[in-house]
């Protein structure tokens, strides 16, 4: 009996084990089939700006009315392609022909030479606190009338180009109800140029400035308060074709020309993450003009009757020297689109002159917005060239500082202390005094900490 019961239980166990194995096989097969049936998306989901918006079209629409939120987000995520496109990235339409290896695009004068006083080079600092970081464009200064205001002069296309963007800026101050235009144009896909501060545009251009706009925003920058609207367009112009006029407005003494060549090696900023893609490829506009036109324009680079004679004749936008004090500095934890705080660089006309450019620094440190010059020294701790100041533990002192546009060259009652506390952090403070003395120096509690 026991033997029969044992055989029955053994047979039942075998059936159970066989059934479990079969079910496991079915389950495994089912899982495999399920995995095979999972559909992989054929495209990656469209890029967005975090929780603000998703997809390029939606984000462009959102940022038209919420530009501040978009700027704050992109300040933390500036590597995003969409951020670069929204905020001065390479926005040249892809169907415009490629530049190839061509480097001569322009053969016409932007302005008649008889209407021109001089051309201010790249890298201008001044008009504090508006231009504390070196400017990315040159200035064409216009002839003046007997009252000292710039005359209204025609402005021309320098070559065969497509206008790709237009910004119409309606001023509230300093001249209420006046209009200022910015025109972005390209001869080919990897190269972009712009004119800023045109007072009028031709009807061919003006007829395209209508809704829907890429964005509209209110902004207040220094002495300017304005509402600007930007429009994507496609307008073909020939070399020498009239684009509009500059001058006439009370505050408008010049118009600007800037250029970006996305084929060039990126500029060697100390902290590349601070700058968008276009800013990494700023170039001298006149390197892309032809022959005689190029030579005659470059011969006018300077300030009033003082010509720039030291290379780069066109000026220099990026002066950072990593691991030293030279270059631009930001308050700690500043976003990508931070307001300008500090530049420790060299003059845009005479690079032998050192220049402090103070922007929106804390008031308690004793340095108000200004540009001050000094003669750099190659040794010692007083007035040392910025490129020689490293994190060596020393405090450096600067005296006999002269205002940028000072006619009598009388030194200010001010000395400035700086110290590189690491290769990427800087301490700075001002003190009312006419001389550094013989040292040594120390900071009080009211100093500012900046970083690359």
For each feature predicted by the language model, list its residue ranges.
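Sec-dependent signal peptide recognition
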Residues: 3-10
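Short hydrophobic beta/alpha edge segments that flank linear recognition/processing sites
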Residues: 179-185, 234-261
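C-terminal motif of bacterial Sec signal peptides marking the signal peptidase cleavage site
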Residues: 17-19
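Short histidine-centered loop motifs in beta-beta connectors
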Residues: 148-151, 156, 187-242
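Surface-exposed, glycine-biased beta-strand/turn segments
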Residues: 84-182, 186-189, 222, 236-239, ...
